[in-house]
Curated annotation (Swiss-Prot):
Forms a complex composed of PxpA, PxpB and PxpC. GO terms for molecular function: 5-oxoprolinase (ATP-hydrolyzing) activity; ATP binding. PANTHER family: 5-OXOPROLINASE SUBUNIT A, UNCHARACTERIZED PROTEIN YBGL-RELATED. Gene3D superfamilies: Glycoside hydrolase/deacetylase. It comes from Symbiobacterium thermophilum (strain DSM 24528 / JCM 14929 / IAM 14863 / T). The gene is pxpA. Keywords: ATP-binding, Hydrolase, Nucleotide-binding. InterPro entries: Glyco_hydro/deAcase_b/a-brl, LamB/YcsF/PxpA-like. It comes from the Bacteria. Its EC number is 3.5.2.9. CDD domains: LamB_YcsF_like. It holds the Pfam family LamB_YcsF. SUPFAM superfamilies: Glycoside hydrolase/deacetylase. This is 5-oxoprolinase subunit A.
């Protein structure tokens, strides 16, 4: 998953946002937004509706948070965390559609769309499947080649993004457990989600300061991350984000969106 590297002095903190839908409220967006630097906003397929999308874009603008599109498979009931059989052509069209939908709200609100990060099962599939990864990367590039693509380091999605001429931002997960091969543990696996703020913050600091995480086997695995994700539906997300920021500040690391100096 990449060579071990030295400490970085700046890191992006991203979170999946705007995933409420109709009367169903998911996440604590108003409390989370001041603590992050990039927001991955749901585009209506796994979560989010037009009102939620507009409201979340406005909330990001209010707090100076960079906005990204968070597209995925068409699976509202499964919250897009279930694998869905789709052809690369279907994935291309669905991703392009969703980017366009969020971009419309960004344009109306005077907010720049900065990046794209696939959600859930699409993210995991694109990380390993070159054809699906290529479809995602082409959709992003065909919409706007200046958009950044968030991807796991060393993944098929990273390679597809680079091949499409995109700037790829390597992503690590502060609140998820890792396997020895550098991939995320399945959510059904013990230790897949780090519930304790102290553990998540320690993992975040390790990725930023040494470029490594401790896998479930106890091995140190290289995860060279430029952005760290904390899931918005994590039950302790506020405490996790505050602890991460405190740990990074103590280590002399600043937080900021990619390209924002």
């Amino acid at each position: 998953m990449g060579a071990i590297r030295g400490p970085v002095r700046k890191i992006d903190l991203n979170c999946d946002m705007g995933e409420s839908f109709g009367v169903y409220r998911i996440g604590a967006d108003e409390e989370i937004m001041p603590l992050i630097t990039s927001a991955n906003i749901a585009c209506g397929f796994h979560g989010g509706d037009p009102q939620v999308m507009r409201r979340t874009v406005r909330l990001a603008r209010e707090h100076g948070v960079a906005v990204g599109a968070h597209p995925g498979y068409r699976d509202l009931v499964g919250f897009w965390r279930r694998p869905v059989r789709c052809s690369p052509d279907e994935v291309y069209a669905d991703v392009l559609y969703q980017i366009g939908a969020l971009a419309a709200f960004c344009r109306a609100e005077g907010v720049a769309l900065r990046h794209v990060k696939p959600h859930g099962a699409l993210y995991n599939t694109a990380a390993a499947d070159a054809a699906i990864a290529g479809a995602v990367a082409r959709a992003v590039a065909d919409f706007d080649r200046s958009l950044m693509l968030y991807a796991p380091p060393g993944s098929a999605l990273e390679q597809a993004g680079l091949a499409a001429g995109l700037r790829v931002i390597r992503e690590g997960f502060a609140d998820r457990g890792y396997a020895a091969d550098g991939t995320l543990l399945p959510r059904t696996h013990p230790g897949a989600v780090l519930h304790e703020p102290e553990r998540a913050a320690a993992q975040a600091r390790g990725m930023v300061c040494s470029g490594t995480v401790t896998a479930d086997t106890g091995e140190e695995v290289a995860v060279p991350a430029e952005t760290l994700c904390v899931h918005g539906d994590h039950p302790s997300v506020i405490q996790v984000l505050r602890r991460i920021r405190s740990e990074l500040e103590a280590a002399g690391v600043s937080v900021g969106a990619p390209g924002a100096d």
